[in-house]
Amino acid sequence: MENAIRNAFTMKVKSGFETEYKIRHDQIWPELTALLSESGICDYSIFLDEETGILFGVQKLSSGFDRSQLSSHPLMRKWWNHMSDIMETNPDNSPKTNSLKEVFHLD
């Protein structure tokens, strides 16, 4: 994806649910991965700090990516509901995230 915007953020999995988090992502719904791709997200990875439960997400976003459109999609909300019992979430069940500032990049 040319002119992709790199995006990094943290989330948190609840203590004791690290394995379940991995299982659910190993079984991610194909229609959700399609939605993410169609929305302009590619090259998406999530890493886990096993000591703290902090999840580090990194993704590339197309220049036309619209987070509000994805956030309001019923399938995205269904996924958030599915994950809400094992993650720190906002009142709407979206994961609590902390955006990270890029301080170095090497291609």
UniProtKB/Swiss-Prot annotation:
Q: Which organism is it from?
A: Flavobacterium johnsoniae (strain ATCC 17061 / DSM 2064 / JCM 8514 / BCRC 14874 / CCUG 350202 / NBRC 14942 / NCIMB 11054 / UW101) (Cytophaga johnsonae)
The family this protein is said to belong to: Belongs to the rhamnose mutarotase family.
GO MF annotation: an example: L-rhamnose mutarotase activity
Question: Which gene produces this protein?
Answer: rhaM
Spell out the subcellular localization from the entry: Cytoplasm
Under which EC number(s) is this enzyme classified?
A: 5.1.3.32
Q: How does it assemble?
A: Homodimer.
What does the record give as the active site? H25 (proton donor)
Annotated pathway, please? Carbohydrate metabolism; L-rhamnose metabolism
User: Which cellular component terms (GO) are annotated to the entry?
Assistant: cytoplasm
Kindly provide the name given to this protein in its UniProt entry: L-rhamnose mutarotase
**Annotated region (Disordered), positions in chain:** 88-107
Keyword list, A-Z: Carbohydrate metabolism, Cytoplasm, Isomerase, Rhamnose metabolism
Read off the HAMAP family from this record: L_rham_rotase
